[in-house]
Amino acid sequence: MIPFFVLAGTFIVCRLIGWAGVDFFAEWQHCLRVAVAAMFFLTASAHWGKRRPDLVRMVPPAFPHPEMLVTLTGFAEIAGAIGMLRTPVTKAASVGLAILLVAMFPANVNAARHKLTIAGSEVPGLFVRTVLQIVFLAAVIAAGWC
C-alpha cells in the first residue's frame, strides 16, 4: 500500500505546488509523471537491502534465478522512473513500465496466495493487489500518453 500512498501523495503535493504558481506543476500530466517516478524510485529501493529477501521469496518457483530477476527489475524500475522525468523518452518509459508491471504481476499473485510478508507486514490480498496493479498501470499509461 505504501507505493500507492507515495503515488497519490506526490501527485497531490505537486498539484498544490502548481496551484501555488509553479508553472511546471500547473499541468496534471507533469504531476503524474513526477508521482510515478517517485513511486518507482521507492519500489526500486526495496530491491536491495533488508527487503530484498522478501522480494526474492515473491518470485514464483517456475521462474529461474529469482535473485537476478529481483536485481534486474530493480534496475528497470530505476530506468523507468528516470525516463518518466525525461520528456523525450516519457512514452517509451511508460510502455516499459507498463510491461514491467504486467511481467511482475505473477510475483504479486504468488505473494498474495502464500500470504508472504514484506518487512514483516503481510502483502495485500489478491483482490486488493489486482486493483492496485490496475491503478498503477493506469497511472503509468496516463503519465506517458496524455
Model-derived features: positions:
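Membrane-interface extramembranous regions
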Residues: 1-146
